Amino acid sequence: FVLGEGAGVMVLEEYEHARARGAKIYAELCGFGMSGDAYHMTAPNMDGPRRCMNNALRDAGLNADQIQYVNAHGTSTPLGDKNETEAIKAALGDHAKKVVVNSTKSMTGHLLGGAGGLESVFTVLALHHQKSPPTINIFNQDPECDLDYCANAARDLKISYAVKNNFGFGGTNGTLIFGNTP
């Protein structure tokens, strides 16, 4: 766990309005989910993040097998990373093993309140450029974190839909799903 500083901003507007004004459209916000598990002030619980991802999939009208990429909350803490791995596997089922997951916090540190904005920008750019950013500094991957974490090098990846997870202290969870533009 390393603290960082930064922020990211995106403009959200109706598709027709953006097209009419000639805006460059990077992605579509397809769905979102939230949950609060109030399990512990700092220790995570897998159920809240799982429900959050399921809520986002339902809101987007998608099945788990339509997701290709997850930008994880990924704090690089043993408890947090194991918890999120289990939540991703619970939400995506057997398809989780086919999804590329990364944590951009491995490169930026944890921006706390600024993390969600910047990591959403990274997620949209991954979708736009069809490339998963790496999770750097994975040299001895925890066997309990057994998903494809795109270790140490970016990878070309056909992405139609991407998930962005952010989890906060006290069990506040948020998930966004972005898709290619129509």
Residues covered by each model-derived region:
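Condensing-enzyme catalytic core mediating Claisen C-C bond formation in acyl metabolism
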Residues: 1-62, 69
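Short beta-strand scaffold segments in enzyme catalytic cores
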Residues: 8-11, 173-177
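Conserved small-residue
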Residues: 11, 29, 67, 72-73, ...
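Structural signature of cysteine-dependent C-C bond-forming condensing enzymes
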Residues: 15-27, 51-65, 86-107, 115-169, ...
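A short beta-alpha structural unit
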Residues: 32-37, 69-77, 104-111
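Short glycine/threonine-rich loop-to-helix capping motif typified by GTGT followed
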Residues: 38-49, 75-92, 111-118
